[in-house]
């Protein structure tokens, strides 16, 4: 820990995934790395036995391209896949273009709207492009489950369905709640865990990853493999990652997300805004740092040997460097210091051609303008930001309820939302 005191920007800040010679770790050492950040491994003893064989395992992650953009919360299982790749194992990333026609009901109290094939295809391509910012494409088998799911005939489907009972499916927490509350459950939703389980059979998965809300589906895969005379997969679940507010899970709808396509300065600033108590969790779930170094950081923080601000800067630089490069991470830190320490307006703020035509009452609806300028996700979020004092015009915070303003105030103005977002109106 003395090294970190003397060189806080040493290896904890500059580490980026790189190809290097690695000695083969023992099964126990691999398990320690794999278990870092995991919520559950079911059963852990079976995973250890698989690792002891010394042959590469087939690690499965299935994703439904129901939304195109990925944030750090979505990337948690991708990071774990990358960990497996670095340990020498094989990865199969399944794009659920077949299951996306249903939509995963996990954690929902209503039926998901079904997407068209065109929407799914477009979302899938965007997802894959972002996923390969994390995964090594050369070590990833990319499969689309429409390959096998859409070729199932009625006989195949009936045989598959015969392996599960309605009572078993209703054990799922979300289905159970909807059933007891007399909320509708569409019959096609019952098929989702069966189809996800069948994916594991087709690719012969050794381990399947998923969120904690996916455990039922993962166990269904294990159960189906056993019934078909195969060695069952191990189920590894990962916790939900809290967003920048430190309370709600990371989500665009909560406005607390850090997107993989965010600009480096935005990404850096958002990471710096997370509560200190979430730093180690972000290191384990969202960073590219090796587990032994994260263990050392956790010990240093607990012993009060490391300054939280330096550790958080290391985290922010590590995350930015993982998605861009070290130069971008360094520039993002300098931009952060300029804006936060000197309260300056950045030199390179984007411009936005605003329509300042007044409404009938002679004002401009600022909430919509903020959304149009990508300073807020929606007019509703913009109103909440205004009410919270988070919107400034030419450096002056607007009072609450200032949704409609004089267009003269906005002509050529610099709009600021929070501490990181700026736009020059032209």
Give the location of each predicted region.
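Conserved nucleotide- and phosphate/pyrophosphate-binding catalytic cores
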Residues: 225-426
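N-terminal catalytic cores of NTP/NDP-binding nucleotidyl/phosphoryl-transfer enzymes
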Residues: 41-105, 207-215, 221
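Well-ordered mid-protein domain cores that form the structural environment of catalytic cofactors
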Residues: 82-135
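Beta-lactamase-like hydrolase cores
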Residues: 23-51
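Short acidic, glycine/serine/threonine-rich loops at helix termini
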Residues: 103-107, 152-158, 246-250
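Short, positively charged and aromatic/hydrophobic N-terminal segments
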Residues: 9-17
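Short, small-residue-biased leader/transition segments that mark boundaries at the very start
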Residues: 1-4
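Divalent-metal (Mg2+/Mn2+/Ca2+)-assisted nucleotide/phosphate chemistry catalytic cores
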Residues: 38, 114-238
């Amino acid at each position: 820990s003395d090294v970190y005191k003397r060189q806080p920007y040493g290896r904890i800040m500059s580490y980026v995934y790189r190809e290097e010679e690695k000695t083969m770790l023992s099964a126990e050492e691999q398990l320690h790395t794999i278990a870092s950040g995991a919520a559950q491994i079911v059963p852990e003893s079976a995973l250890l036995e698989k690792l002891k064989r010394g042959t590469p395992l087939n690690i499965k992650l299935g994703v439904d391209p129901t939304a195109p953009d990925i944030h750090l919360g979505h990337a948690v299982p991708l990071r774990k896949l990358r960990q497996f790749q670095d340990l020498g194992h094989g990865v199969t990333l399944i794009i659920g273009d077949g299951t996306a026609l249903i939509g995963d009901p996990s954690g929902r109290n209503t039926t998901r709207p079904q997407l068209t094939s065109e929407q799914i295809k477009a979302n899938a391509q965007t997802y894959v492009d972002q996923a390969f910012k994390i995964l090594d494409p050369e070590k990833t088998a990319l499969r689309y489950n429409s390959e096998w799911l859409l070729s199932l005939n009625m006989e195949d489907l009936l045989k598959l369905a015969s392996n599960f009972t309605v009572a078993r499916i209703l054990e799922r927490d979300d289905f159970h709640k909807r059933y007891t509350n007399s909320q509708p459950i569409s019959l096609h939703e019952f098929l989702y865990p069966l189809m996800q389980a069948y994916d594991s059979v087709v690719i012969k998965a050794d381990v399947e990853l998923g969120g904690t809300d996916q455990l039922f589906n993962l166990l269904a895969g294990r159960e189906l493999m056993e019934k078909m005379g195969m060695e069952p997969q191990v189920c590894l679940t990962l916790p939900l990652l809290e967003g920048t507010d430190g309370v709600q899970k990371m989500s665009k709808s909560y406005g607390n997300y850090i997107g993989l396509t965010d600009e480096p300065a935005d990404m850096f600033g958002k990471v710096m805004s997370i509560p200190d108590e979430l730093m180690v969790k972000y290191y384990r779930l969202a960073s590219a740092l090796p587990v032994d170094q994260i263990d050392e950081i956790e010990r240093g923080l607990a012993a009060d040997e490391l300054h939280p601000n330096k550790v958080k800067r290391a985290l922010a630089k590590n995350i930015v460097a993982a998605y861009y490069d070290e130069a971008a991470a360094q520039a993002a830190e300098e931009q952060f210091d300029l804006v936060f320490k000197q309260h300056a307006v950045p030199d390179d703020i984007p411009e936005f051609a605003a329509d300042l035509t007044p409404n009938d009452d002679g004002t401009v609806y600022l909430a919509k303008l903020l959304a149009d300028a990508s300073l807020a996700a929606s007019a509703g979020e913009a109103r909440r930001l205004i009410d919270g004092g988070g919107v400034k015009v030419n450096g002056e915070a607007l009072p609450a309820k200032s949704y409609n303003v004089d267009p003269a105030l906005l002509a050529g103005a610099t709009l600021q939302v929070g501490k990181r977002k700026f736009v020059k109106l032209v």
